[in-house]
Amino acid sequence: MAAAPEYQLYCFAQSGNAYRVALMLNLIGADWKPVWVDFFNGAVRAPEFRAEINEMGEIPVLVHGSRKFSQSAVCLTYLAGRSGKFLPDGEDERLECLRWIIFDNQKVNGFLGPYRFLCNFAPARDPGAEAFLRGRLTNNLGIVDKRLARTPWLAGSAHPTIADISLAGYFYYPAEEFGFDIAKDYPAIGAWTERIKALPGWKHPYELMPGYPLGTK
């Protein structure tokens, strides 16, 4: 009988938050297995999920032996520490890395994820909410684009860090799912996405996680 993988990741293909962790696992060459979560049919709201997997009712959830982690930034930090890869160099870079992870979670993917959900997966469109999120995204993506025009990696380091893996969450989903092309509209971000794609182990979210096309496992 084959040995169980070292890591398990509760995820589904449409989740950029889960993609961050799946991508990190692949980039560090971890022995891991995805566990599909039927998000769109309410699996994360089920009492069993909240009791046994994550009381917050969210994915991703990373399982490593008897340890269980939720929130993608926590998962990325844990994996970086375990592997010694994608870590910032020194205290200044560590704080800069944390600064951009927080900005990303609040202002970039924190808006991009809900915007994409409303445009593609919500039962009904909400033009007012979509317009609000799109306006915030225009400003916040512009901030990131200016940053990446000055430095190849988000934390200002000579190599990618978990800040870059965090930012990558939603940027590789098809442009038609957003109604605009991030890579073309923000050239420095576009060049950065190509640098991430060139890293050994990179895969598209729809290749890396189960559940695409929608309704499949």
Residue ranges and their predicted role:
Residues 24, 80, 170-171, 206:
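Active-site-flanking alpha-helical
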Residues 202, 207-217:
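C-terminal helix/juxtamembrane-tail motif
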Residues 56, 82, 150-151, 199:
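Structured helix-beta-strand junction loops
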Residues 74, 188, 201:
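Residue-level recognition of oxygen-bearing side chains
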Residues 100-198:
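GST-like fold's C-terminal all-alpha helical module
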Residues 51, 198, 207-208:
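Phosphate-coordinating loops and pocket residues in cytosolic domains that bind phosphorylated ligands
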Residues 12, 38, 162, 209-212:
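Short, solvent-exposed turn/loop segments enriched in Gly/Ser/Thr/Pro and often Arg
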Residues 1-131, 135:
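GST-like domain detector, emphasizing the conserved glutathione-binding G-site
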